[in-house]
Amino acid sequence: MHAEEIYTSLQWDIPTSEASQKCQSPSKCSGAWCVVTMISCVVCMGLLATSIFLGIKFFQVSSLVLEQQERLIQQDTALVNLTQWQRKYTLEYCQALLQRSLHSGSDCSPCPHNWIQNGKSCYYVFERWEMWNISKKSCLKEGASLFQIDSKEEMEFISSIGKLKGGNKYWVGVFQDGISGSWFWEDGSSPLSDLLPAERQRSAGQICGYLKDSTLISDKCDSWKYFICEKKAFGSCI
């Protein structure tokens, strides 16, 4: 009787292999679940970081697009304003020309006020002392050039003008090339042989021509004289 109790007790205390497997399986399942959970967490963190990065980039691109749109709007506005100003200016200019033509009528003058006409040219005699280069610039400001003598008749006409006082000297547009010694007008053409300076100054400096009492003479270009400007007459009024 006592031996049976001991045997029964031993049978009760020794665990079976099936029970042992049941106890070990939960620990194995728990380890695999942890690995899966960790991988899922890493993937989620990666997706979250990617989403944040893409969100930042999208915000930056959106800001650049908005900035470019604002610049385009400003440029369009400036262009519209410029176009409107040009139209307004053109309209005002055309209206002014129309009013001028209506008021002038038959009073069309081929030369500006106080200029003297001869054929297709207008002349103005400046009675102030200037060097040749300075007088050339003064004529350019008037839309003209220094007087170019194309014929004896033209020189006689200029000499007959009452403003050309006897004895005064007036620069004209002829000068001597320092290398070749040839004479040229401002436009690059050469004077006629009978219109070359009669009295020629010999000097190391540049030599230019001036008119005195119907005679063309040469002198140093840095000397001071009066001068005569010439421009084309208005073709519609000739």
UniProtKB/Swiss-Prot annotation:
Q: Which residues form the C-type lectin domain?
A: 118-230
Q: How does it sit in the membrane?
A: Single-pass type II membrane protein
Transmembrane stretches in the record are 36-56
Q: Which InterPro entries match?
A: C-type_lectin-like, C-type_lectin-like/link_sf, C-type_lectin_CS, CLEC9A, CTDL_fold, NKR-like_CTLD
* Segments on the Cytoplasmic face: 1-35
Q: What happens when the gene is disrupted?
A: Deficient mice shown no alteration of dendritic cell phenotype and numbers and the response of dendritic cells to innate stimuli is not altered. No alterations are found in leukocyte numbers or frequencies in spleen, lymph node or thymus, and mice appear normal and do not develop any obvious symptoms of autoimmune disease.
Annotated compartments? Membrane
What this protein is called in its record is C-type lectin domain family 9 member A
